[in-house]
Amino acid sequence: MRRAIELAARGLGSTSPNPVVGCVITDASGAVVGEGWHQRTGGPHAEVHALRAAGAAAHGGTAYVTLEPCNHTGRTGPCAQALAGAGITRVVYAVSDPNPQASGGGATLRAAGIDIAAGLLADEAEAGNAAWLTSVRLGRPHVTWKYAATLDGRSAAADGSSRWITSAESRADVHRLRAESDAVLVGGGTLRADDPHLAVRGVEGATQPLRIALDTRAALRPTARILDDAAPTLLVVGEDADTRHLPGVELLRLPLHDGRVGVHDLLTPLFRRGIRSVLLEGGPTLAGAFLEAGAVDRVIGYLAPALLGAGPAALADAGIENISDAQRLDITEAVRIGPDLRITAVPVPVTTSTATKEH
């Protein structure tokens, strides 16, 4: 199953709005005879690739799949039937399919006399498919907040300069994150301060994400780098914003509340558009708004071995006033990226947080 999870990760960035899935087939003796993963939207599913690789050796064998085999006919046929037709006698899957349109594959296989086991390495498989699972369960895109900071938590120096806090290795890793995401989002402050480009560079075969600029007053300059043709761009503005200086730019007009776009008011139309994962690269204010709205599902921080002592923090007001209200995180990974440290963490649900509140 761990190998199947590794295979599934190869589909990140190319299968959305569908899940990433990996499959390993063993023969009757337990030897691996076929592997596969879902490679692109509309293409054969992982089980089909693995069955093709296994051929006749799949008969009497076991299929290890990261997600419950689908039970519906879309652009491809149901994988549950493909497994049964190949003579597979046992199916082990990590995560049950929460999509009502495709779930039920386990029951179909069981009805066909196939032995079923679920839940093997479920946590690892869930983490690898977090974007799709979050979107199905919550009806909104999965959001990763990415930031870069010094060890004392500064995202820029006192004079506003921030290029470059982290190393070239960390910046290359960010391009990998972009390539795995459906969309990259920044706010007006970042647009004005950095004139970011946000397209993927240096990742072979990458699908360019949708670049989203949240600029309520449409103050974006027509010469902004985000408006070039390297990747698609969506400009999110207030309902009454004057955009006559930006002809040809795709717009999403949303109502403002106290001068701001509501986080969920933004995520809902993005989900309807087919966006399942958003990489939030905005500054501290936008990050704070998403955190306050409960819309940060993963945090990836690149920490540089440097100290500034002054300058803006990586996170601004998130509606937290007391230490007992702090958003606790579960660190899932800490690795060296060049001279920097990359920390990946997920929010701890309030109900299970170690923080205590006085009543």
How should these model regions be labeled?
Residues 4, 22, 70, 109, ...:
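Residue-level signal for inorganic ion chemistry
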